[in-house]
């Protein structure tokens, strides 16, 4: 990444202003930040913006989505180039940089820096809320929220008041369990089942109003979090409004799937049913600006695969500039491979969770299942949600019953092995270790009951998940997982590597202290990030020297996480001489590296400009392009209120 001084930034902004041929950008109010991007006429598709917020010294950038309306096409320049405008109203306090990039055909971000239009850093006067940059699979932590039990009030407004708590916890996506009115006919419990929807176009009055939902989503977006709605497509409540208004959406003989006495099966052989369901899902994108769906029971044989392909395509294309992501309740790698190519972004690592329960006292079996989870990636081209509990699991059993003393170590496992970890409604506080939440009745969480060991562990894990490149998975499965020889079947050890960072995870899954030697490590200085015996300290960065064959001692159910190497985002791509900026001096330093043929991993992070995995003459050309791009006159305009 290139860094520009405040003076040079100002001069470049001034130069951009002079070259904006037709449009005279103006600030409409003192609370507005406008960004203009001029795209070459040959470029097709819609541009996207990545916003990077740094800390006070301008390092450790955190990506975030642009927290304002989608880009607006303003028109063409005399040369035929296209002008796009973004507007943001909010507050900004930290140094902020902007990267423009283009979606590739799959809709995911093109992560190659050589394809970014421009990067600039400036001391703006407003804050852009923290979060991750655009949609990156598995870089997210998801939180399943049951409104009835999340707060004592059981409302959207009360949940909104706790959004800062979720943000501080490190949550990226909030999955709201079904918000619709629940069926009355055949009702289960005092509340009825959330998965027996009575009206797809209404908000349960117990939770609040449509305005309350809009306010919740807006407040979440302001904090850099996304909101998913839980969606039941297979069936409706027996007293759903469609029963009287659209009886033709159902089977000719009303049937209850799986013996559920409170719902009727929909008939997806009918075009009208499919169109109505898609319209209902689009409704909430329109009305509440939601960001996606967790779809219930997608493995149902009564819903054709073609419907999911059709629906997901329609949802993702519905609102230009809006990213919609989809989680399907099914294990597509093992159980429902027919759904793999429908457009899902995530599935459930369902078999993995079941295997952890079945092997809670069998460390060798856990290792086998971990290998299977990583191996499943050969057969699946979407990302996976990894979890220990959810509404189905916790309704029937506590985490201690399911996992015993390994509930803590398995929590570390779900955050560090692979995929997007899920936290369910108070799980982070340890509340679910010994308690079950009944989603058919009110059983509000007591937030004063906290297991500090679990809470400190989860907070450390969410922070590490977002900051350690080795723990970030992407669509190309770039993170390498290597299982190590521990000399003791109770101790599981593995490393993950990506870019310039390596993480080492140690888990004692046995019932007694383990003293053993782990081989195959990269010798040198590591940082001890998470230590069960010092978990009150939370996430640390204690320097520790490890040898290639290192002795470790862990208590029963214990865990340690180490890492080495700087995050890739701290490596200042192109800043080869490490002076904090990109200049001609970096070109000289790059040539010196090529001449001496002396390359280490930290150099790769700074000097592999063209991202081909090595330092070569091609990087010289790419660096020259970077240097020249800092002086192009028609790239971007930014104005400061």
What are these regions (language model features)?
Residues 1-22:
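Sec-dependent, cleavable N-terminal signal peptides
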Residues 24, 33, 96-99, 118-122, ...:
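Active-site-proximal helices and loops of the catalytic beta/alpha 8
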Residues 41-92, 105-113:
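Aromatic-rich carbohydrate-binding modules that target alpha-glucans
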Residues 90, 543-569:
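C-terminal beta-strand-rich structural cap/linker in extracellular carbohydrate-active enzymes
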Residues 124, 524, 555-559:
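Tight coil/turn sites that cap or link beta-strands
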Residues 133-157, 161-289, 303, 310-319, ...:
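Substrate-binding/active-site clefts of carbohydrate-active enzymes
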Residues 506-510:
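Asparagine-centered strand-capping/turn motif at beta-strand->loop junctions
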Residues 567-641:
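Cellulosome-associated attachment modules in secreted, modular CAZymes
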